[in-house]
Amino acid sequence: MKKTLLLLLVLAATLQSCYQKPETIANNDIDPKLRETIKAKNDSLFEALSDSNSKVLEKLGSEKFNKFLVAKLNGVIWPFRKGYLTTDHEVYEEFHNKHTTVPDNSTINSATNGYTLTFQNEAKETYVSLLKSSYMGIDDYLITVIYCKKGNDWKIEEITAGLLSVYGKNAAQVYAQAKEYHEKGYEWDAYQQLNLARQLLEPAQKLIKYPEEKEIIRDYESMDKKISTNYYMPYILGNIDTKPIIQQLTVVKNTEGIFPLISYTTQIRLSDSVSLSNELKDIKTEVKKNYNWINFKQKYIYYRAYNVNDNGLIENSYTFTEKN
């Protein structure tokens, strides 16, 4: 009996010593040598994506990844081919993970950026690289690379690409801006920010989730319905003698931000700059009076005038920029 009990205790101690809890090490806490190893692979990856070098991509990928190489890279390689992205990139976040079960669904919670990343680990050790690459200093794309340790080497098991942020703000941060606009009564500006936040919800396809996702979708759909119902176009500015017609409210993206664009048709020929400018003064007065749900204190407000021919087709346009 004593021998049996002793054997059970020894077995329990052995099993406990062999058991390893799942572990995730983030960013600067990761071993520097390992970070350098992965950095070299990421640099090679970006060079290969930029050049569409399938041989290098196959060398970096695992056997399973290479079986579906074309499908895996389909949504990743197009920003490089279209010139949106180059080899320039920086680490957004990175995680070294140790797992107890293979394969299994693993979850990482970002303490820095507030998202949850869920993926299937195909090895006892994985490394997740979240790499940011910018287009014209406006749009930030996220290239998410999941490496699995195969023997003594690290191989790509998964890769995705998506829009991470605009003007340095991700979905959660843009949503916060939308709520600020809404609280101030600027419903149209809130709507534009909600629409943008919605577009930023999948920087890594379905791998990354923000806790605000349901709220963003709910608030966008609610505001979209309200805008469509209450703020109709076209709208005739009847108090102005020339009767210009507001046709559309959209936005302009420049290097400093997203700003309102008010498009209208006018009976004044665009070549008559004096009359056109005088009419614009009246348009600004009427628009600011009737559209108080737009923030006209923004740095730029754009007005675009159109001429329409006898067949109702747009001939020419001219854009005015109001700088506050």
Which stretches of residues belong to each language-model region?
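Generic helix N-cap/helix-start motif at coil->alpha-helix transitions
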Residues: E36-I38, A123, S133-D140, K169-V174
